[in-house]
Design a protein with these regions (language model features):
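C-terminal interaction modules of eukaryotic adaptor/scaffold proteins
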Residues: 278-332
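N-terminal targeting peptides
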Residues: 1-121, 125, 139-142, 319-332
Length: 332
């Protein structure tokens, strides 16, 4: 699996002498055997070889327990290095190697955790490798919590940030059902889902317009965990409902969030009102607009005009006058 980790490597010709690749691997191996792990980032950065093989591939010659010990020692040695982005290549190669090894977990999760805690972001291809390794493990009938808790056997502990990256990886390759299972199972490993956890999966569900499941997850995060959905997540859900012409459900979601004392932003109200107008649900649009004004928001003038005109077109004169007065009072 070819991974290009930085612009310098991307500019390299694909054809390189085998000797230069072997020399780099030998140099890395020498530092590993001498436990001079802190020198490895400089080795990888200074190398001008475009890596068509992983410089840590020699790890495969070590027994599993020795491999775990070496990687753990290396991860610990990288923590104090500054700038924190300096070990980026090292983390990337370690993550690539562990995820493609015959027994990726729990070591790969430990590497991923340290990568994220360092502030480094795994390369995009990691989503594919992590999802593939995870699904292979799950096919062996291992539960979500069981796989995550294996980290404890090597001195690490699963956390929400690591789980959230796993969720984003599964969603990136459209494994949405598995993402939901991880979302529901991560609590068993002591990783309580947060707004980001739910936001990632809800956003992915909305992308493919699986609104029923997205609605259930939204209600679950609010009621079961007492979480406040991000405005971006809410907008995605309401937009998906509008695209599916399920505007009544969008209105119900806003009412649900208001009842649960969760804030609803201007963009969300405006989006739902426009959806109501598209379906000629003028009374419903007026209802949402009234609720919107009660929270200090006022629709755009074009939207206000459409609501009044729509109500008039269906002979809802009394309601049209009341809504107009409400808009006028708020403007003043």
């Amino acid at each position: 699996f070819l991974l290009c980790f930085c612009p310098i490597l991307n500019r390299c010709p694909l054809v390189r002498s085998v000797s230069s690749l072997q020399n780099l691997e030998q140099a890395v191996r020498a530092e590993v055997e001498a436990k001079n792990y802190i020198k490895i980032p400089d080795l990888l950065i200074s190398s001008d070889a475009c890596q068509i093989s992983n410089p840590f591939s020699f790890f495969s010659s070590f027994p599993q327990n020795i491999r775990v010990q070496i990687v753990d020692e290396m991860l610990q040695s990288l923590i104090p290095i500054r700038p924190r982005s300096k070990p980026q290549l090292t983390y990337s190669y370690l993550l690539s190697y562990t995820l493609q090894s015959s027994h990726p977990f729990p070591l790969a999760l430990a590497v991923l955790q340290r990568t994220l805690r360092s502030g480094c972001l795994p390369v995009p291809q990691t989503h594919v490798l992590l999802s593939s390794a995870w699904l292979d493990q799950r096919c062996l009938s291992h539960s979500v919590a069981n796989i995550l808790l294996q980290m404890q056997s090597i001195g690490y502990h699963p956390d929400c940030v690591t789980c959230n990256y796993l969720l984003s990886s599964l969603c990136a390759v459209d494994q949405l059902e598995e993402a939901v299972k991880v979302l529901r199972g991560m609590g068993g490993a002591g990783c309580i889902p947060d707004s980001s956890s739910y936001g990632t999966v809800i956003g992915a569900m909305c992308r493919v317009r699986k609104t029923a499941k997205a609605l259930n997850l939204m209600k679950q995060m609010v009621v079961q965990y007492g979480l406040t959905p991000g405005q971006g997540t809410l907008v995605k859900l309401l937009a998906a409902l509008r695209a599916n012409r399920e505007i009544w459900k969008a209105v119900e979601m806003i009412e649900f969030l208001e009842k649960e004392s969760n804030s609803v932003g201007f963009e969300s109200y405006e989006l739902v009102i426009e959806g109501c107008l598209e379906k000629r649900e003028y009374v419903l649009a007026a209802k949402v607009a009234t609720g919107m004004t009660e929270r200090g928001f006022i629709p755009y003038i074009r939207v206000r005009q459409k609501i009044i005109e729509g109500l008039a077109s269906i002979d809802e004169w009394k309601l049209a006058c009341a809504v107009r007065q409400r808009f006028a009072a708020l403007k003043s």
